Amino acid sequence: MKEEKKLLLQEVEEKISASQGFILLRYLGFTAAHSREFRNSLSGVSAEFEVLKKRIFFKAIQSAGFDIDSSDTSGHLGVVFAYDDAVSAAKQVLDFNKQHNDSLVFLAGRIDSANLSGKEVEAVAKLPSMKELRQQIVGLIAAPMSQVVGIMGSALSGVVSCIDQKIQKN
């Protein structure tokens, strides 16, 4: 049994090092169907949900050199490992949570090399994603440009109209 725990610890350490971040959750009233649906929703954002033993998870993050508050870790715990964008994974957890009557509680996390409390992870999940921010920036840049094009177009049509009237008079 000890060898099995060592292998599990090594596997969790590998997942932590391969991920861009992780989110520690407490789950309440999760059925097998909820778990399957949650895992499927996370696969769309390159993340996975694992139910782990507390000791193994905390040993793994300790050996990785991370300091996560373990004071409020009662109940059933699970970890979301985000392999691409940890913020998108946090958003997906928040969306799933809204749809399923707050069956998940954010306990802690690590996003972009920062250790966060559960409330901080939830706050990050509520921020706009990089894609949304890029769209907003493009919109901010495009709006004045389209106004300039409109002004230039109306100025040119005014000049063309004046020339046309001069031609018609002569």
Swiss-Prot record:
Record keywords, A-Z: Ribonucleoprotein, Ribosomal protein, RNA-binding, rRNA-binding
Ribosomal protein is among the record's keywords: yes
Q: What does this protein do?
A: Forms part of the ribosomal stalk, playing a central role in the interaction of the ribosome with GTP-bound translation factors.
State the family it belongs to: Belongs to the universal ribosomal protein uL10 family.
Q: Share an example GO biological-process annotation for this protein.
A: translation
Q: Which GO terms describe its cellular component?
A: large ribosomal subunit
Q: Which GO terms describe its molecular function?
A: large ribosomal subunit rRNA binding; structural constituent of ribosome
In terms of InterPro entries, this protein maps to:
Ribosomal_uL10, Ribosomal_uL10-like_sf, Ribosomal_uL10_bac, Ribosomal_uL10_bac_type, Ribosomal_uL10_CS_bac
Instruction: Keyword check for Lipoprotein, yes or no.
Output: no
Subunit structure as annotated in this protein's UniProt entry: Part of the ribosomal stalk of the 50S ribosomal subunit. The N-terminus interacts with L11 and the large rRNA to form the base of the stalk. The C-terminus forms an elongated spine to which L12 dimers bind in a sequential fashion forming a multimeric L10(L12)X complex.
Tell me which domain of life the UniProt entry assigns to the organism this sequence originates from.
Bacteria
Name the encoding gene, please.
Answer: rplJ
- Its recorded name reads Large ribosomal subunit protein uL10
One Pfam assignment: Ribosomal_L10
Q: Which organism is it from?
A: Chlamydia felis (strain Fe/C-56)
- Output the Gene3D superfamilies linked to this UniProt entry: 3.30.70.1730, 6.10.250.290
